[in-house]
Regions:
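Short acidic, glycine/serine/threonine-rich loops at helix termini
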Residues: 58-62, 110
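Histidine/acidic residue-rich metal-binding segments in metalloenzymes
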Residues: 1-47, 61-64, 76-96, 143
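Glycine/Thr-rich phosphate-binding loops of Rossmann-like dinucleotide-binding domains
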Residues: 34-36, 57, 106
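Non-cysteine beta-strand/loop elements that form the S-adenosyl-L-methionine
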Residues: 45-57
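Active-site-proximal loop/turn and secondary-structure-junction residues that shape catalytic pockets
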Residues: 11-13, 51-53, 102-104
Length: 151
């Protein structure tokens, strides 16, 4: 049908199935494996890592009583996990689009995503392109929006 589709995925099996079925992008991708990364490269699937959301959950887990005790270990682990997954996916060659899962963290802090992306190894210009031209290409509207040009 030519639709742009996204899957909110954390587990590798769900990602593998979504990518195999032709999903346009994977959001979060927390437990992404190298097998999934390779399939994403093969299928041209984009990855929207939302590192800032994972880091925000991790920080909130350090506040006593913020989450139920049973949730705290998982919440503490998600920030480092999603950060490491992003670094591996970027280095492997998965196409990256900027995204933050806004609402998980304080409004106005989405720019932190650039910081996390560059700290994990993405050059600053590629991080900027992940928020401008790359999503425009993913959406098929790169002739209309996405470029930053003089003039």
């Amino acid at each position: 049908y030519g639709m742009i589709t996204a899957a909110h995925e954390h587990g590798a099996e769900g990602m593998k199935r979504a990518v195999a079925a032709g999903i346009t992008s994977i959001e979060h991708g927390t437990m992404m494996t190298e097998e999934v990364m390779d399939l994403m490269i093969e299928k041209g699937t984009y990855y929207v890592p939302t590192i800032t959301a994972g880091k925000a959950v991790e920080e909130k887990a350090k506040i006593k009583g913020y989450y139920p005790a049973v949730v705290v270990p998982k919440a503490l682990a998600i920030g480092p996990q999603i950060y490491n997954t992003f670094g591996k996916a970027y280095k492997r060659g998965v196409k990256i689009c900027f995204g933050t899962d806004a609402g998980v963290f304080t409004h106005g802090e989405n720019g932190k995503e650039f910081y996390y992306m560059t700290q994990a190894g993405m050059p600053a210009m590629e991080a900027i392109q992940s928020a401008t031209m790359t999503p425009a290409i993913m959406l098929g509207i790169e002739d209309e929006i996405g470029s930053i040009e003089a003039g």
